Every structure is written in C-alpha cells, then in structure tokens.
Amino acid sequence: MPARSWLLFTVLLSTACVRHTPLASVENPNVITEDEIRDNGAGTIYEVIAQLRPEYLRDRGPAALTGGARDVAIVFLNTQEYGPLSILNQVAASDISEVRYYSGIDAVIKFGRAYGNGVIQLISRTH
C-alpha cells in the first residue's frame, strides 16, 4: 500500500508543477486571427499574410491530386472561390476578421478536388 500511495503522490505532484496553457491561447498556425490582423497594421491582407504566415503564399508545385494546373493556393472569400493569390493585394486588411489556411488534402476534403494546392479562406467582417 505505501508504494501505491507514493505513486499517487508523485503523479499528483508532477501534474501540479506543470504549467497549464489554456487551449484558446495556443496559436493555430493555420489561422490568422482578428487580433493578429489588427495588431499587424498592414494595409492589405496580402501584407498581413506575407508578414505573419508567408508559407501560405509559397509555390507548391504541380497539384498531384488534381492533375495539376494550379501550383499555388486559391483564395476563397467566405464560402466562394474569389481568385488567385494576386487578389489578396486588393483586399483591405480591415475588411477581414480571420484568415484560414487549408493544406492540399484538407482543401480537397472541404472544397473539392480542384483545390489540391490548398486554399486561403478569408472571412469577411460582414459575413
């Protein structure tokens, strides 16, 4: 019995000493939040993404899942296809509340097989 009590004490002590971080404060690398957009101070959403998550903008090579015409992520505004990456230069950062990035496989599952190189989804403030 003393060994069992000692084990319980050790487990309780070790978990009490661990720093617990609330899930909400853990940064999601696939999301740029409204606070991040506002705090960045950039004029366009392209500038925000280029500064905070430049990997969203990189060339991904031929899309193996789609037979490949598209080699970069496609931009969606809310739930509709909006255009190529260059359209991000025309979107004011202040009009966007969140940016979500979907990798190729995640984009195919959510948006369809034409999006094998990923999707950058902009969530507008008016959505």
State each model region's role.
Residues 96-127:
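A beta-strand signature from Gram-negative outer-membrane beta-barrel systems
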Residues 1-7:
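Bacterial N-terminal signal peptides that target proteins for export
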